[in-house]
Amino acid sequence: MKAAGIIVEYNPFHNGHLYHLQKTKEITGADVVVAVMSGNFIQRGEPAIVNKWARTKMALLNGVDVVFELPFAYACNSAEVFAYGAISILNSLGVNWVVFGSEAGDISLLKKIAMHLAFEEDEFKKYLKIYLKEGHSFPKARELALKRVSKEDIEFLPNNILGVEYIKWILRTNSKIEPLTIKRVGSLYNDPNLGSGSFCSATAIRQNINNLELIRDKMPPFSYQVLMEEIESGRGPVSLNDFFEFFLYRAIVYKDFLKEQFDVKEGLENRFYKHIFSSSSLEDLLSKVKTKRYTLTRLQRILIHCLVDSKVNQKTLLSTKPYIRVLGFNSRGKRYLNSIKEKVKYITKLDSYIMKNPEYNSLLELEIRASQIHALKYKEYHKYLQLEFKQHPIYIPSRE
């Protein structure tokens, strides 16, 4: 079966995502569309608004055929690590295409930029070092260096950045996957405004989550229904500020609670400790700690990894192949899974897999902890703390 891969978060699934899915099917003619989706925490360092099982259901009801999990360690990380994890999974699955949205909408341009990034010529390294010395954050320094060596005036907006990273890893891994891009329509990735049309960003939906009538027309009916069910059942919405007291507890009990954590350098733990007890919320704390070098999303990811007690470093992640776990599938997806089961070892039952495959224990332990921490903010949290072991992949028959 010819398979098209998409890399998603669906936080939550909105009309822009449906457009991306429909265009993917149209331009590839694929027999099946497989999604690699973030779990309960997302790339920008926030909890998903509802859990991964609800978002898997949204995906399947709207026409995705199989949903695979992007493990926490990759999902809540830099664009480079996020992209590596997702492309590694799609490589293992042997998909024919990866189709992603971008602000540029120009695959030739993105490929040209990715070539510089994939092979890091001396000229690129020289300018990167210069811009880092000037005090820019790593993402900004890299953006400036890429513009300098490529002589392209591309805007390094979130989806362009991820698209370049996907292509970079396709090049570095000598992958046979063909990258394709669809020009993003409607609002920018992090635009907080709902606007008057049917398209808006997931950010805008999350910021207006307490006024459900306002967001109804921005989401496909199936997605809106699932979101309503989750909220009415007390399993959402979950937000970053919900976890502020957990960080306060860690700061009170463990003075050096950040020192050994993921991505903490240059005395950053001291800045956190200096401001945490005078802050009224996580947003307040982050506004005090943020610097030119440490972006808001980077700080949020640091806090999330602290919350989950993740000490795994990027170098290890970039030399490790992530596990392949099925979150859900439809009838076409079932046929696809049957067609690859002889060559791809994928997880459907977590408990039995852990016992047989100890090499993935550290990644799976992080995933389990992340899911349990996410569940602590549900109304009846005690019912969901073991959900990782109880929940089998969701099956929804295809509407063919």
Swiss-Prot record:
Keywords tagged on the record:
ATP-binding, Cytoplasm, Ligase, Nucleotide-binding, RNA-binding, tRNA processing, tRNA-binding
Note the coiled coil stretches, chain numbering. none
Q: Name one GO molecular function term.
A: ATP binding
**Which transformation does this protein catalyse, written as a reaction?**
cytidine(34) in elongator tRNA(Met) + acetate + ATP = N(4)-acetylcytidine(34) in elongator tRNA(Met) + AMP + diphosphate
SUPFAM superfamilies in UniProt: Nucleotidylyl transferase
Q: What is its EC number?
A: 6.3.4.-
Annotated Pfam families: HIGH_NTase1
Q: Where is this protein found?
A: Cytoplasm
Annotated residues for binding of ATP = 7-20, 101, 159, 184
Example GO biological process: tRNA modification
Query: Which Gene Ontology CC terms are recorded?
Result: cytoplasm
Q: Which InterPro entries does the record associate with it? A: Rossmann-like_a/b/a_fold (IPR014729), tRNA(Met)_cyd_acetate_ligase (IPR008513)
Instruction: Describe the function of this protein.
Output: Catalyzes the formation of N(4)-acetylcytidine (ac(4)C) at the wobble position of elongator tRNA(Met), using acetate and ATP as substrates. First activates an acetate ion to form acetyladenylate (Ac-AMP) and then transfers the acetyl group to tRNA to form ac(4)C34.
Entry similarity comment: Belongs to the TmcAL family.
| Name used for this protein in its record | tRNA(Met) cytidine acetate ligase
Which gene is this protein's source?
Answer: tmcAL
